[in-house]
């Protein structure tokens, strides 16, 4: 047993130290890769009663030390593993993989118990014996399958199949009135322990199905199975159909809620965009208004220019003193209609009064 454990440790070390891509190992965080092999198993494992055995050659069991060192190719170590293998799952496959890799040269024989033995000692199975045989046959680690395997291994059975070691997990298996059906195998030094895979078993799978029975029953009714095939009563069938309709309505309501939320979100985004655009346009409008009507706006400049032109029109600038003076011709007297009085002549005093009135008007406009 010590040699076996040391061989397993060494094999694990070799796997860890094997270089991966770019010389990296598993310790570097990069899993090592193996070469792709196109050669694989093309046929299922044969049954034991279909294999010709040469009983003329004597059968001599190998020891644990010899098995760990390695045996010749023509004499592999014959390891036997048995079980029910109902609803064949990854836990079964891993157990058989461990049994296959116990020794460098291993021939794995797997025994599958019949329906009669299983129903008597363990309970009812989901799959019948033929389905369980077929499932084990197609496991890649299996070299031979024994149908109708015994519940307790006898010396005659071990000798008939020339078994060197029996592989199973080390947990005592109490059944058939015995605390451990593998106790005599352990005492004989023929027991090779394997590790049970936690979190997966046939009982766990059945528990999941029973826990969610209504879900799976409704699912199969939708897929065309009848209530009779599912062993479902008439009332439960109608209940499942009603639940299915309710679930569809709930789904539609949920879809509508999600779509309405998306619509509201889009409206909020659009409203935010509109508000931002409105603020920008308002700023532009206010800026344009101030440019036109503000204290320094264009309108004030226009009024100033108009006022200046009006002042120039009312009181034109006098010509410089250097220029020759021109005498004005006396303006003709204006006669008011229906009166014999003439219009008063423009005097310097009247011109000064007119200028004073114009200045007052301009000051009022500036205020």
Swiss-Prot record:
Summary of the knockout phenotype: Early embryonic lethality: zygotes do not form blastocysts, do not develop past 3.5 days post coitum (dpc), and fail to implant. Mice with a conditional deletion in B-cells show defects in B-cell proliferation and class switch recombination.
Ranges of compositional bias, category Polar residues: 315-324
InterPro entries documented for this protein: CCT (IPR041723), Cyt_trans-like (IPR004821), Pcy1-like (IPR045049), Rossmann-like_a/b/a_fold (IPR014729)
Name of the protein in question: Choline-phosphate cytidylyltransferase A
GO biological process, one term: isotype switching
Tissue: Brain and liver (at protein level). Also found in heart, kidney, spleen, lung, skeletal muscle, ovary and testis.
Cellular-component GO terms for this entry: cytosol; endoplasmic reticulum membrane; glycogen granule; nuclear envelope
Pathway: Phospholipid metabolism; phosphatidylcholine biosynthesis; phosphatidylcholine from phosphocholine: step 1/2
């Amino acid at each position: 047993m010590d040699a076996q454990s040391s061989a397993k440790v060494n094999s694990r070390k070799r796997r860890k130290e094997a270089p991966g891509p770019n010389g990296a190992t598993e310790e570097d965080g990069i899993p090592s890769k193996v070469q792709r092999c196109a050669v694989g198993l093309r046929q299922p494992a044969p049954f034991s009663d279909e294999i010709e055995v040469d009983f003329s050659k004597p059968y001599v069991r190998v020891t644990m030390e010899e098995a760990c060192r390695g045996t010749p190719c023509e004499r592999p170590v014959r390891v036997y593993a048995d079980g029910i293998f109902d609803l064949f799952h990854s836990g079964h496959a891993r157990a058989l993989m461990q049994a296959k890799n116990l020794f460098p040269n291993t021939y794995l024989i797997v025994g599958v118990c019949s329906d009669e033995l299983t129903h008597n000692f363990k309970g009812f199975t989901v799959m019948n014996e033929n389905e369980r045989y077929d499932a084990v046959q197609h496991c890649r680690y299996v070299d031979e399958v024994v149908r109708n395997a015994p519940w307790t291994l006898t010396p005659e059975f071990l000798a008939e199949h020339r078994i060197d070691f029996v592989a199973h997990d080390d947990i005592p298996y109490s059944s058939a009135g015995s605390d451990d059906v593998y106790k005599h195998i352990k005492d004989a030094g023929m027991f090779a322990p394997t590790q049970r895979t936690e979190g997966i078993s046939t009982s766990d799978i059945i528990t999941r199905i029973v826990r969610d029975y209504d879900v799976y029953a409704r699912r199969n009714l939708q897929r065309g199975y009848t209530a009779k095939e599912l062993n479902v009563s008439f009332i439960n069938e109608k209940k499942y159909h009603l639940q299915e309709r309710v679930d569809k309505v709930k789904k539609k309501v949920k879809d509508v809620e999600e779509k309405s939320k998306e619509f509201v979100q889009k409206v909020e985004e659009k409203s935010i965009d509109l508000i931002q655009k409105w603020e920008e346009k308002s700023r532009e409008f206010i800026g344009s208004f101030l440019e036109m009507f503000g204290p320094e706006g264009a309108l004030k400049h226009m009024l100033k220019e108009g006022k200046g032109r009006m002042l120039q029109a009312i009181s034109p600038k006098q010509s410089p003193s250097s220029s020759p003076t021109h005498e004005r011709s006396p303006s003709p007297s204006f006669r008011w209609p229906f009166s014999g009085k003439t219009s008063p002549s423009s005097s310097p005093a009247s011109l000064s009064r007119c200028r004073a009135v114009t200045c007052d008007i301009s000051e009022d406009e500036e205020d």
